[in-house]
Amino acid sequence: LFRSVLFPAVRAQSLEECRQAAEQNYPIIRQYDLIARTTELTVRNIQKAWFPQISVTAQGSYQNKVTAWPENLQGLFAQMGLQLQGLSRDQYKVGIDVRQTLFDGGTIGSRREIARGEGAVQAAQTEVDLYKIGQRVHEMYFALLLLDEQLRLNADANALLRSNEQQLAAMLKSGTASAGDFENVKAERLSAEQQQTDLLSQRQTLQRLLSLFCGIPVDSIRRPPVPNLPSGENKRPELRLFDCRLQLTDAQEKALDAQLLPQLGLFAQGYYGNPGLNLFEDMMKRRWSWNGIAGLKLTWNLSALYTHRNEKSKLRVQRELIENARQQFLFNNRLDETQQSENVRRFRAIAQRDGEIIALRTAVRKAAESKLAHGIIDVNGLLREINKENAAKTQQAIHEIDMLKAMYDLKFSHNE
């Protein structure tokens, strides 16, 4: 209701307009932006691994043994009047540790590609979910189109019955028709009006559902043009999802290979504490001091070899599962396309006879009207012919809508 007040002039009357409106209205559309933002933030965080990594530490400990002067030296110091106690058993330090990566073997880059690959998979899955929304719009749109045709044909039949009812009323006054004939036609006309009311109610319900689904008022729809049948490459979003999942496994494999390479970096450590790096001085004075160390560090994690082969095998199995899922999808999709192609051919063949059948039914109905006027047949014979003519027109409308829907089903299966 709020959207209707804000956007009262928006109308979606074509199939494509309804589909696009439904996609924009469906809550999952917001996931595209959320996925992109999350992926970008993740990549930025990973990239910051190239920044200097700084940590602050504070430590206090107690040791049962510490570095001490040999006993002979302690005796010598005592003779000299020096009281040297050695290092204290309780030791403390507060420091800072800085590390800068120079070469990581491709670990950071592979993590970045994995993050982007995961984002691509999530976006592709969202596209698949949105594509299913199009199928629901597709079904409601053609159901609404069929109801419009049924309403039109029922209105034509109602007008025809009303015309015959008026003719019988005149004949009743002149004494050439019975009251039973007049009442029979009137009852048939009222039945047609009752059916019209039911069809209108169905249309209003379906129209309301489609409007809510699209997020905009759908007042009227128009029959879509006859499309060209698909003949090119299959563009279903599920295929892109499979490709993204395979690309993610490639990034994961590169990350495994990067774990086998050594890493090189600079490091610097500084702390204020007791004891310091000059143990001899601290053994003599036991005082807090500033200390620092810097250098170049090479790290090679050989334990990654333990699981490397198994992890590679897991990725191969994962690729096989993805390819198997792709083949299953393509197989089922080909079955759907084959069935839809056969439906198009079947409805096209059936529709070729509809025009001829309607022309014959119309001629028979007109002849029945003439016979009734001359008293050759009763009103029941006319009603039978009117119903047969209306049924033939209804079947033609159903065949045309079904054929058109089958064509768009085929395009939908191919995403064209």
Labelled PLM ranges:
Residues R30-L34, Q47, L102-L130, G180, ...:
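Sec/SRP-type N-terminal targeting helices
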Residues E17, L41, D129-R240, R245-Q247, ...:
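Periplasmic alpha-helical coiled-coil/stalk elements that build and connect Gram-negative outer-membrane
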Residues V10-K65, T176-S178, C214-Q252, L261, ...:
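Bacterial Sec-pathway N-terminal export signals of envelope proteins
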Residues E188-I216, A359-E416:
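Short segments within alpha-helical structural elements
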Residues T57-D97, F267-A304:
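Small/polar, glycine/serine/threonine/aspartate-rich low-complexity segments that form flexible
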